[in-house]
A protein has these predicted regions:
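Conserved catalytic submotifs in the C-terminal HATPase_c
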Residues: 27-37, 72
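Short helix-loop "hinge" at the ATP-lid/N-box region of the Bergerat-fold HATPase_c
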Residues: 57-58
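Short alpha-helical Gxxx[C/S/T] motif in the catalytic ATP-binding
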Residues: 109, 113
C-alpha cells in the first residue's frame, strides 16, 4: 500500500475513458472536490476498482452518469438504470450476476471491485434510488 491521491487517480481513469464516453454518447457529470484526498491504498487495486465500476456504468447507462468525490473520501457513482430494481441491485456484487440486457457482461467486475475495496479497508454499497443505480465507495 502507498499514499494515493484519489483525486488524481480518478481524473486519470476518467480521461482514459473519454473516447468510450464519446462513442457511447455518454455525458458524465463529474464532481471532484478541490481538496486532495489521500488514503493509504494499493494503487493498482484502486485503478481496477474505478475501471470496473466505470465499465459497469457504461454497460447499463442510458447516456448519463454522475461521479462525485467528496472530501471525506466517499465516492458516489450514479446512473439511470431503468431496467434494474431493488431486488436486482441487492445481487449486483454477486460473482457472475448479470442483468439480461447487459452489453458483453460477464458478471465479475463489481464482484472484483467489492473484494478490492474490502482488501483496502473500504466499503462499497449499491442502492436503487428513483430509477438510478447508486454505488457508494468509502475509503
Amino acid at each position: 500500500k502507498e499514499n494515493c491521491c484519489i483525486n488524481e487517480i480518478l481524473e486519470e481513469i476518467l480521461a482514459e475513458y473519454y473516447s468510450i464516453f464519446k462513442r457511447e454518447n455518454i455525458i458524465p457529470d463529474i464532481n471532484i472536490c478541490h481538496e486532495k484526498v489521500y488514503r493509504n491504498l494499493n494503487k493498482n487495486s484502486l485503478i481496477r476498482i474505478f475501471e470496473n465500476i466505470l465499465s459497469n456504468m457504461i454497460k447499463y447507462s442510458n447516456g448519463d452518469f454522475k461521479v462525485n468525490l467528496e472530501r471525506s473520501g466517499t465516492l458516489i457513482f450514479a446512473n439511470k438504470a431503468e431496467n434494474l430494481d431493488t431486488t436486482t441491485v441487492q445481487k449486483i456484487f454477486d460473482r457472475y450476476f448479470t442483468v439480461e440486457n447487459a452489453k458483453s457482461a460477464t458478471g465479475v467486475g463489481l464482484s472484483i471491485a467489492k473484494q478490492l475495496v474490502e482488501l483496502n479497508d473500504g466499503t462499497i454499497t449499491a442502492k436503487y434510488i428513483d430509477g438510478n443505480l447508486v454505488v457508494k465507495v468509502k475509503f
